[in-house]
Amino acid sequence: MNIRNNARAFILNDNNKILLQKFEFSFTGALKVLWVTPGGGVETGESFAQALERELFEELGVNVEIRNGSVLTLDIPFEGKNGEFISHEVYYLVRMAEDSAFSLENMEEGEKNTFHALKWWTLDELRKTTDEFEPRDAILRLLENSDIVV
């Protein structure tokens, strides 16, 4: 089975809100709109941390140096239009100010066309929303831990 390596960020602000991006996805054949953590695919020759630094620049227009190790690894099976694959996702914890300036200027054209929104979420908002977000359980567990330190 094919494996797609992805580097992703749990971006938290000083109030332990998490930054999520709303995208539409159609790689499984059906259109799905959901909130996800920033990040993306690891390119040949990149470490996961290097890939995340590049992805955060492309998707958010921010320069971040990943200095800490990963906090979570998930292997998520998908049945896509081109067959089955596993999304091997490595997550890092990143702190940013809530008033950080973000830019979509460096986002790839295909991503710009499927991007809907960017939002800081509280734990309470995520518990109450009917919107889909992933990885749901990991995000909720992270925000329930009130003594997160980076």
Which role does the model predict for each range below?
Residues M1-V36:
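N-terminal strand-loop-strand
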Residues D75-L104:
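Active-site-adjacent beta-strand/loop module that shapes the phosphate/pyrophosphate-binding cleft
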Residues M1, L31-L34, N82-H88, G110-F115:
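A generic structural micro-feature
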Residues V42, M96, L123-L126:
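Hydrophobic pocket-lining residues within nucleotide cofactor-binding pockets
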Residues F27, A101-V150:
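Nudix hydrolase/Nudix homology domain
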Residues K22-E24, S70-I76, A97:
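Generic short beta-strand segments
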Residues I11, L93-R95, K119-T122:
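Short, well-ordered beta-strand micro-motif
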Residues T37-V71:
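The catalytic Nudix box helix
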